[in-house]
UniProtKB/Swiss-Prot annotation:
Protein name per Swiss-Prot or TrEMBL: Protease HtpX homolog
Record flagged with keyword tRNA-binding: no
Annotated GO MF terms: metalloendopeptidase activity; zinc ion binding
Cysteine-cysteine disulfides: none
Annotated source species: Pyrobaculum calidifontis (strain DSM 21063 / JCM 11548 / VA1)
C-alpha cells in the first residue's frame, strides 16, 4: 500500500520533472524548428495527437507485458483509468459553475448580440451564452452538456478593442467550441496522469518482495520509463494545445478578417507588456489554459492603441523558446506570423 508521504513517488516526480526540463530546453525546440513549415496545421495536429496516443499505448503495453496480463493486472489498469477519467470528468462538469462564481460572470445583452452575429457568420449550430467577467483583457470559452456553451469576455477586453477586433476575439472563442477543444483537451489531459500513476505503481511493485529478482528489475525499469514518458506526453499535450490555439485563430480570422485578429492580439500583447502585474495575475490563474492569452502579468488600460508598424514590430519580437514549450498558448509573435499565412 502506498503511504501518504511517498518518498518513491516524490523522487520519481523530481526525476520526471528534470527529464521534462532537459527535453524542453534541448530537444523540443530543435524538433519544433525542424518540423515548422514542413507540415500544415492539420498535419501537425494529427502527428502530435498520434504521438500522444501511441506513446501512452506503448507504456500501457509494457506494463501489462511485464506485470503479466492476469485478471488482477487488467482490473487494476481498468480501475486506474476509470478513476483518473472520473476525476477529470467531475472537474469538467463542475468547472463552469466554479468559473461563473469565481469571475462573477454576468449576461450582457449587447455582447450577446455580437456573439450571436459572429456565431451565425461561422455557422455555429448551437446556442452560445455571452457573459462579461471582471479582469484584465482576456476572453475564454467554457461549458459542457449540462450548463451549455459560454463565451466570456473580460471588462478589460471590452475597453481595449474596437468592434471588429472584438468580433475576431469572439470568433476565436467560438472556434474553440466548434472544434470541441474543451472535450478533446480533457481527453488528452487524462493520459499523462494515467501513465504517471502506472509508472509509480510499477516501481512500488518492483520494490515489493513478491516477485523474482528479474521480475522486480523489469517492473522497476518499466516504472521509471513510464514516469519519464508521462512527462514527455505532457509536453506533447502542451504542444497539441498550442496547435489548437492556432486553429482557433483561424476561426477568429474568418469571423472578422486577418487584420482584426492580428490587431486584437497585438493590442493584448502590448497591454501585458505595459502591465507586468497583470501578466503575473493571468499566469497564476487556474483557468489560464482557457484564455485567449496565457503566456502572461490587473488593471485595464483603455488607451492602448496599435498601429500596423507596431504589429509588424511585434511579429519580429523575441520570445523564450523554453517558456513556449511549457505553455498552453503560442507566443503572440508566432500567432501573428501564422495569420499572415492564412489564405483568407
Amino acid at each position: 500500500m502506498i503511504p501518504v508521504f511517498d518518498p518513491v513517488a516524490l523522487g520519481l516526480y523530481m526525476l520526471g520533472y528534470l527529464f521534462m526540463f532537459v527535453i524542453a530546453a534541448t530537444v523540443a525546440p530543435r524538433v519544433a524548428g525542424a518540423v515548422s513549415g514542413r507540415l500544415t496545421l492539420y498535419g501537425a495536429m494529427a502527428l502530435t495527437g498520434v504521438m500522444i496516443v501511441l506513446t501512452t499505448a506503448f507504456v500501457i503495453y509494457l506494463f501489462v507485458l511485464v506485470a503479466a496480463p492476469t485478471l488482477a493486472t487488467v482490473s487494476f489498469l481498468v480501475g486506474l483509468i476509470a478513476f483518473v477519467v472520473l476525476m477529470n470528468l467531475l472537474t469538467y462538469v463542475a468547472s463552469p459553475y466554479i468559473i461563473n462564481a469565481s469571475y462573477g460572470a454576468r449576461p450582457d445583452p449587447r455582447l450577446q448580440q455580437i456573439v450571436d452575429e459572429v456565431a451565425a457568420r461561422l455557422g455555429a449550430p448551437f446556442k452560445l451564452k455571452a457573459v462579461v467577467v471582471d479582469g484584465p483583457p482576456n476572453a475564454f470559452a467554457y461549458g459542457n452538456f449540462l450548463t451549455g456553451r459560454y463565451v466570456a469576455v473580460t471588462s478589460g477586453m471590452l475597453s481595449l478593442v474596437d468592434r471588429r477586433e472584438l468580433e475576431a476575439v469572439i470568433g476565436h472563442e467560438i472556434g474553440h467550441h466548434l472544434h470541441r477543444d474543451n472535450a478533446i483537451m480533457l481527453l488528452f489531459g487524462v493520459l499523462p496522469s494515467v501513465v504517471y500513476y502506472l509508472g509509480v505503481t510499477a516501481v512500488h511493485m518492483g520494490l515489493g518482495s513478491g516477485n523474482s529478482r528479474g521480475g522486480n528489475a523489469a517492473l522497476l525499469a518499466v516504472g521509471v520509463v513510464a514516469v519519464l514518458a508521462s512527462f514527455l506526453i505532457q509536453l506533447l499535450v502542451l504542444a497539441f494545445s498550442r496547435l489548437r490555439e492556432y486553429y482557433a485563430d483561424t476561426a477568429g480570422a474568418k469571423a472578422a478578417g486577418k487584420e482584426a485578429m492580428q490587431f486584437a492580439l497585438a493590442k493584448i500583447h502590448k497591454f501585458y507588456f505595459m502591465a507586468p502585474e497583470a501578466r503575473q495575475a493571468v499566469s497564476e490563474s487556474k483557468f489560464r489554459a482557457l484564455f485567449i492569452y496565457a503566456l502572461v502579468n490587473a488593471v485595464a488600460n483603455p488607451f492602448v492603441t496599435i498601429t500596423r508598424a507596431e504589429v509588424e514590430q511585434i511579429k519580429r519580437a523575441n520570445y523564450s523558446a523554453l517558456q513556449e514549450v511549457f505553455s498552453t498558448h503560442p507566443p503572440i509573435p508566432k500567432r501573428l506570423r501564422f495569420l499572415d499565412q492564412l489564405p483568407l
